[in-house]
UniProtKB/Swiss-Prot annotation:
GO biological process, one term: proteolysis
Cofactors (names): Zn(2+)
Sequence positions that bind Zn(2+): 131, 135, 207
Stored InterPro entries: HtpX_protease, Pept_M48_protease_HtpX, Peptidase_M48
Protein name: Protease HtpX homolog 1
Membrane topology: Multi-pass membrane protein
Gene Ontology cellular component annotations, sorted alphabetically: plasma membrane
Protein localization: Cell membrane
Length: 287
């Protein structure tokens, strides 16, 4: 219920943002066009956001014959978690990471990068996938996928506004002055902040909850703790290969650890809790 409320709020916020932009640049006609566009976008976000994210990372669905260990782990964990088996995907990237997506447990998918499969042991992968299945069980995946889609749209608007301002803008309501360009510049500044706030709406507390639930599913909290330490180090020292699929800022919150590097300012808006704290909590768990 809580996640459905967040989903509704996010979709309503996107509609409001687009209508305001439409009103600024096109008056009543612009508002109507923006509203219709928002309706289509909201529908697509709800039903297809998971497919958009998987396509964004060029994730390939794999069969038990293609990835036997991965399927063996998932098969064992879904029985313990009491949820349907999700589709299993692999992302061709040396970046060691994983994520889950899908609008509900019956339409879910888990994805692991080639980097994480090379880095972690069998039991550590159990810990990671148990965490991702906990997100599925807790129905975090819909709100995460929608947030990724909406953040991507907002970021696209920011880039559009930036280039429009550089090349003279569209005048907006104030065709005789600089109102249009000022509005575009304001949008270029505000939109990335809005995208970040969308991601922060996906509370960091859900990661702690998924860690705890994942540990209960696997019965191996130490395995997830070991995996998180390796992943934190692996992502901070990751060097992309030419063929690698790169992490997108709009969907960074979906991964088990933050795949993006950032300085002190970005840490204020981090989408994940500090890894050391997650590890400390996991190591304190007893079963």
């Amino acid at each position: 219920m809580k996640n459905m409320l967040k989903t509704t709020v996010l979709l309503a916020a996107l509609t409001g943002l687009l209508v305001i932009i439409g009103d600024y640049f096109g008056g009543t006609g612009g508002m109507i066009i923006a509203f219709l566009f928002a309706v289509v976008l909201n529908f697509g976000s709800y039903w297809y956001s998971d497919k958009i994210v998987l396509k964004m990372y060029r994730a390939k669905e794999v069969s038990p014959a293609e990835a036997p260990n991965l399927h063996r782990i998932v098969d064992g964990l879904v029985m313990k978690a009491g949820i349907p088996k999700p589709k299993v995907y692999i992302v061709q990237s040396g970046m060691p990471n994983a994520f889950a997506t899908g609008r509900d447990p019956k339409h879910a998918a888990v994805a692991a990068t080639t980097g994480i499969l090379e880095l972690l042991s069998y039991e550590e992968m159990e810990g990671v996938l148990a965490h991702e299945l906990a997100h599925v069980k807790n129905r975090d995946t819909l709100i995460s996928a929608i947030a990724a889609t909406l953040a991507g749209v907002v970021t696209m608007l920011a880039h559009w506004a930036q280039w429009a301002a550089i090349f003279g803008g569209f005048g907006g309501r104030d065709d005789d002055g600089n109102g249009g360009i000022v509005g575009l510049i304001a949008m270029a500044i505000v939109a990335p902040i809005a995208a970040t706030l969308i991601q922060l709406a996906i509370s960091r507390s859900r990661e702690f909850a998924a860690d705890e639930e994942g540990a209960r599913i696997s019965r191996k909290p130490w395995a997830l703790a070991d995996a998180l330490e390796k992943l934190e180090y692996g992502n901070s020292h990751y060097r992309a290969r030419v063929s690698d699929v790169q992490a997108k800022e709009s969907s960074a919150h979906m991964f088990i650890v933050n795949p993006l590097k950032g300085g002190a300012v970005q840490s204020l808006f981090r989408t994940h809790p500090v890894t050391d704290e997650r590890v400390r909590r996991l190591r304190a768990m007893k079963f």
